[in-house]
Amino acid sequence: MNQEVLNIFNPVQAAPTFDQIRISLASPEKIRSWSFGEIKKPETINYRTFKPERDGLFCARIFGPTKDYECLCGKYKRMKYKGIICEKCGVEVTLARVRRERMGHIELASPVAHIWFLKSLPSRIAMMLDMPLKDIERVLYFEYYIVTEPGLTPLKQHQLLSEDDYMRAQEEYGDDSFTAEIGAEAIQNLLKAIDLEKEAERLREELSGTVSDMKQKKFSKRLKILEAFQESGNRPEWMVLTVVPVIPPELRPLVPLDGGRFATSDLNDLYRRVINRNNRLKRLIELRAPDIIIRNEKRMLQESVDALFDNGRRGRVITGANKRPLKSLADMLKGKQGRFRQNLLGKRVDYSGRSVIVVGPELKLHECGLPKKMALELFKPFIYARLDAKGLSGTVKQSKRMVEREQPQVWDILEEVIREHPVLLNRAPTLHRLGIQAFEPKLIEGKAIQLHPLVCAAFNADFDGDQMAVHVPLSLEAQLEARVLMMSTNNILSPANGRPIIVPSQDIVLGLYYLSVARDGEPGEGKIFADLGEIEAAMDAGVVSLHAKIKARHTEMTPEGVLLRKVIDTTPGRMKIAALLPHHPQIGHRLIEKALTKKEIGNLIDIVYRHCGQKATVIFADKVMGLGFKEAAKAGISFGKDDIIIPVRKTAIVEETRKLAEEYEQQYADGLITKGEKYNKVVDAWAKATDRVADEMMAELQMKHKDENGREKEINAIYMMAHSGARGSQAQMKQLGGMRGLMAKPSGEIIETPIVSNFKEGLTVQEYFNSTHGARKGLADTALKTANSGYLTRRLVDVAQDCIIVEEDCGTTKGITLRAVVEGGDVLVSLGSRVLGRFTAEDVKDPGTGELVVPADTYIDENIADAIEAAVVQSVKVRSVLTCEAKIGVCGACYGRDLARGTPVNIGEAVGVIAAQSIGEPGTQLTMRTFHIGGTAQVAEQSFFEASNEGTVRVIGPTVVGSDGALVIMSRNTSVSVLVDGKERETYKPPYGARLRVKDGDLVKRGQRLGDWDPYTTPIITEVAGKIRAEDLVDGLSIREEVDEATGIAQRVVADWRTSARGSDLRPAMGVLSEDGSYKRLSNGGEARYLLSAGAILSVADGDEVKPGEVIARIPTEGAKTRDITGGLPRVAELFEARRPKDCAVIAEMDGRVEFGKDYKNKRRIKITPDVDADGNQPEAVEFLIPKGKHIAVHDGDYITKGEYIIDGNPDPHDILRILGVEALANFLVDEIQEVYRLQGVPINDKHIETIVRQMLQKVEILEPGDTGLIKGDHLDKPEFDKEQEKAIARGGRPAVTQPVLLGITKASLQTKSFISAASFQETTRVLTEASVHGKTDTLEGLKENVIVGRLIPAGTGSYLRSLQRVAAKRDEQLAQQREDAMEPLPAEIALSDAE
């Protein structure tokens, strides 16, 4: 009874709970069943009375009353008449809220095609009827008749007839011998006539019978849509509307403005046009108007309904009175301002304030300063409640007055309310989850929020006028989550790479660095002190200085855990830092007996976190910050102009390089090198010179100068700032005191003349002009790429949002193999750091002894990682999200460590979103950082390799001895490795044509150069000696003399011979002949003929004698472009979108021998003949057609292995997947993407990239459907396919054959299982059209779709609730089953047996 009473006064029902959402086509019956009445008039409201017109668009009889519990005429008012329908005005007495829910409808006088299914490509109606879209449009818009029933006439089904044809046919065959119709009725009847089952059956037969690819594709597309209609229970004719639904009036409001005008939603205009035309059409039909008029009206009706659904999709856009296009139903949904992104995903939060931030150095790490005024406003409801509870005020009104007057007791209560009630601080843009953190508020005077200095790095905040928003978590659960998960003290490590993010910066670093400096000859050197107090007394007395080398007693913990005091060598400054270190066996004074740079302090915090846990780290960080600020202030470090040192040798180096550049100019003038080569060499020389000047400058800055008493002078202040990492970089110092160096043009090319001056000397006018390019380009790039980076993040989040940890362990034995990242002899990323925080997939054994280092399924922590490093293991197979076999989401063991916590990941962690944020966040950071070095070009070219270990050289692969006795590498797969104690420590694959400085079996020292090559050209080298013969080198066709204007020197360059008809069948080549005029034989049995590609520069002429290892021709490579993230962000996007690169590499599909076949038009034919396989069968050879003029990296007769490049370039990721498989693809993508970030010095953990790649590899393509009933060429999710496959195998059918497909992130997002998520991402119309035809069900598994329907997301706390719901549902099923079992009567079975 109570519930009933409550219902009367509070009619808000709990929203119905649901587990999934289905979208399908609405039948006319369905639309009528939703509707509360037909709308017959286009009127809206009476402009005098403001009452809705009857039967109009706002009719109260259909949609409900405008005021709560009051009919329109006012006969029935108040609650007691609830549910009565007024006999005068026909309005039901109920809540006005029903006007938001009740729909109406319009009965159309003539059917109308739904524009989404007609025009949204691929057109569903056209596919159902198997007709071109153009023809269907002609019929719909009354241009042509369509034959629906040919009868016995020679006309064909679906044939189009113009007006004249139709007349003629009627005369010829008689009126009744055939039927042809026109307009939407015709299309509707054709759709009605389709028998889905028969049609599908027929298509399947045709599919199995056809061989041509085109037809197969066409049939399978059509079959798919037929099956979709069959399975979803939709009828094709529903794509043509006979009834149009009208949405509730409150959702398309009409608002009176002052001055008797109205503001209205565009939908009302659109509906009005539909109703007007519909009514006119009805009247014309009743009046039996001429056909042509009716037809015109029908066409106009079709157009008006089109505009209502999707304005501008067909024909011209319908505009309103103010010439602005009207916003149709489709526009309401799509785009950034549409329903999905603006209102469902972009909800705003209440209880928030925002203000400027200032620094709060005396705060603790978990605190923030909140202005009193702001706190009072934010915590108002809490204050009212507390005032009431304490009996200080009787009513809310009274409380309100007290708070407004700011009476003294209010402040006391505010203190109580705020105590331990965390607030969230957010700084836009929130690029990763550390952009919102929780703090305990501390009331302060003033109007600015105080922020702790150490969290600035996470927020990317600075105090130059940044603003931050404050949000108050209201419910107890929210407060709990804020405290446990979001408190700044819980976010010490960065989720992107697991390194501390709460790291001192700027002043603090400078203070600590200054403290940790030790200097010779300081007062008090060599004294011994008992403790810190004694040192401080001595410093106050001036007996000892901060940097003196002294001895002192220091307490440390032994490995047994006992505190021990011992005398150590230190300085007073270092003692101060040592006093802050927590006691732990692993943490001793040795960690700080060095100059503490920013990096060292970061490592220190990391070590404290690993060994002593979170609490100790927070306390330590706070203390360190205090000390750093204090000491930086005391040190008073400053610098003047004279602190910028210009190196003595600068002029000498510049002159030397000038001479070198002139020499190159001369060589170019003499025709020894090309213009491009000269450019490359000059740029390179100047880049090297700039670096040398910078090194000289740094060396002079570091030199220790002593005064006459032997005391060291103060270190240079600028050097201190840069070296400690407090501010500035070596690149900036180089520009202050060295030389600015090379500049880039806006196009990205490097200007040949460098800027020789530095900022201290001042730039000349010309230099200044040159340097403005870089600066301007930097600023322009920043603006553009911020947007690009944001869009990349959005796509990444969208593709990865449903990747959640769902279980502890999926139990797979698969994994990926990780190796150290080595480049040019330097280990960039060690194996230990790559495998850290993962689970091993199989046993790791010592390569030398074969003994077990780590068993399988072990979590690799720091200690185990060190053990793996120590055992010199080359590679480790670890679990990875790429190989995880969890059905939805991924499992904890495959993911490994939660980087932000340093422990194995928890169930319910949204690892996909974290991955997307970690990759996207630096994108914005980096783009904003392009201009810091002022556009100074850095040429990143590597042209040699050195040994990084001492050992023996082993050269494997073809080489030849050149004229100077050096080995020249003759193949793409020659490898040079260094062995230590017989174990391979490092391996290099130098490029073709590199010259080795060592021979096989030589002993090398560490750092010794093993070989080098010219980075600017690729040579073509002869393997044998003999006489040169030029072939097909026809002057003016395939070769041209390039005479340089500047020098008048000619050189012979191979021209592009395909441009003219005469040269189409030339094959320019250089042959090496023996005495008798035949070709020399090469070691692999081929002829010594070297094909030349366009652009090659000849080094020898016809008839010259050559020796082995001599260069016949050079192919210039592109000039060095600046490697900025400018190349980086688009590169990352290109990789994630899996686009085919422009000039992509051609990859060998199998092992085999290369042959050059007969040429085809202007393509070269390359054939790979594989070896005979184990059964003695000869597999089929593979042919490639390659455009002439491309440089082919293999030679006739070479043996190549699968996956090798036949043509150099960027490989196509799809090829890698097809030829080498998933693991190779993952390695390629991870390495390429990491390279971009590494170049910028941004550390990101590999597993984030792997997570995104997993999402790109979710689909498989059906190659052979077998007996699964799937369609060839279909793309399916792996779990779905597995289900179908199991069914087929269980039936005893043939299994299907599939291959994995790689989808770019945009495509993968649009093809996700959830149509809600896809629709809110991009191409809303297309997604919804497809989903409704297929009758798709969204099971609400990802985060996005749950946010949109307003439920808890299935991650974090929500994932636990989700699992509880699952358990509950299972239990309910079991209980129901038990009940049924209990109810079953027994006698039925007995009766059965009698009957038998």
Swiss-Prot record:
Transmembrane segments: none
GO (cellular component) term, any one: DNA-directed RNA polymerase complex
Keywords from the named record: DNA-directed RNA polymerase, Magnesium, Metal-binding, Nucleotidyltransferase, Transcription, Transferase, Zinc
Comment on bound cofactor: Binds 1 Mg(2+) ion per subunit. Binds 2 Zn(2+) ions per subunit.
Coiled coil: none
Entries under SMART domains matching the protein: RPOLA_N (SM00663)
Residues that coordinate or bind Zn(2+) 2: C810, C884, C891, C894
Record carries keyword Disulfide bond: no
E.C. numbers: 2.7.7.6
Chain residue ranges for the region called Disordered: 1372-1396
Molecular function terms, GO-annotated: DNA binding; DNA-directed RNA polymerase activity; magnesium ion binding; zinc ion binding
Cofactor(s) demanded: Mg(2+); Zn(2+)
Reaction catalyzed: RNA(n) + a ribonucleoside 5'-triphosphate = RNA(n+1) + diphosphate
Family annotation (Pfam families): RNA_pol_Rpb1_1, RNA_pol_Rpb1_2, RNA_pol_Rpb1_3, RNA_pol_Rpb1_4, RNA_pol_Rpb1_5
Binding-site positions, Zn(2+) 1: C71, C73, C86, C89
UniProt-listed CDD domains: RNAP_beta'_C, RNAP_beta'_N
Compositional bias per record (Basic and acidic residues), positions renumbered to this chain: 1372-1382
InterPro entries the record matches: DNA-dir_RpoC_beta_prime (IPR045867), DNA-dir_RpoC_beta_prime_bact (IPR012754), RNA_pol_asu (IPR000722), RNA_pol_N (IPR006592), RNA_pol_Rpb1_1 (IPR007080), RNA_pol_Rpb1_3 (IPR007066), RNA_pol_Rpb1_3_sf (IPR042102), RNA_pol_Rpb1_4 (IPR007083)
Function description: DNA-dependent RNA polymerase catalyzes the transcription of DNA into RNA using the four ribonucleoside triphosphates as substrates.
Subunit-level organization: The RNAP catalytic core consists of 2 alpha, 1 beta, 1 beta' and 1 omega subunit. When a sigma factor is associated with the core the holoenzyme is formed, which can initiate transcription.
HAMAP family: RNApol_bact_RpoC (MF_01322)
Name assigned to this protein: DNA-directed RNA polymerase subunit beta'
Biological classification of the source: Bacteria, Pseudomonadati, Pseudomonadota, Alphaproteobacteria, Caulobacterales
